[in-house]
Amino acid sequence: MQNAEYAYELPESAIAVHPAMPRSSARLLTWRDGAVTSHHRFKDLPAILHADTQLWVNNTRVIRARLLLMKPTGGRLEVFLLEPHERSMEQALASTQCVVWKCMVKGAKRWTAGEAALQVEDSRGKWEVTAKRVGMDEGVRYIELKWTHRSAATGDVQEVSFVELLEAMGKMPLPPYMRRPAEEQDAEDYQTVYAEVPGSVAAPTAGLHLDAQLMANLSASTSIHHITLHVGAGTFKPLVEGDVRNHVMHGENCSVSFDAIQALAEDGVHRVATGTTSLRTLESLYWLAIKWKETGEQPFELNQWEWRNELGTKADRLGWSMETAMQWCANALDRKDWSFRT
């Protein structure tokens, strides 16, 4: 599979930089067995999906991952948070003291010493964040962030979490292909209506087409199930290899509840994954089940080509369907949720 085979012209006029209003009025192309295609709108989904369909959505929530800081020299610095260093996403966002994040930094070439900082004042009070370089690895910088918040009512320093700081001071991390600065409306527009678990630095894009009314209509005819995959900045990494199979996919953290595992164990239903992040999670679950069965130990990571190499042979030998694999996992999990990296 050569990179050049996937090259085509996409005019900028065809790239949406703001969502359709309402969201479910966006266009939808359907494909059925026999290569039959038809054109619809997302609002038509309830009539298109089978009545026994399980609709799987990714309930990750995009964090305000861009911080615009000032260097000691007065120059501007843009820090793009990628993922926490040596902490889980949940721990880092809940921290009230100090965190170290892996970051991409614009304007860092002349940031040779000192702390970058930013101060913001809103109805809640005064916020201040400082950033210090503590390391670098393969172009990714390790940035130590500290912050304070003074109450508008009392002037006292109050303990706030890192995610609260980001809500007050951060900017939404719009995709680079939009080529426009983030606006306050993006805090709503660049978020799915079912976003719940903070941790992504990019939205699970397919889900942006579903609005509250459509979700209500879908709930009447299908069962909706949530999984969590925190989308990383690697989703925008360009293909530079001649053979696309040599492209190294970035890892992403997922979490699936025990109830979701049980739903996947049900026989005789149709399943529809909303976008590639939901599909990646479901496919990974199957291969992790094969890995668990073969090794006897619960796995928490799936590497890029495991499914094609040793796990593929083992899956052929077992002959497991998705339902069989999830039935086995449901018994082995003992009612526990499953978090992993894929």
Give the role of each language-model region.
Residues M1-T342:
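Surface-exposed, charge/polar-rich loops and edge strands
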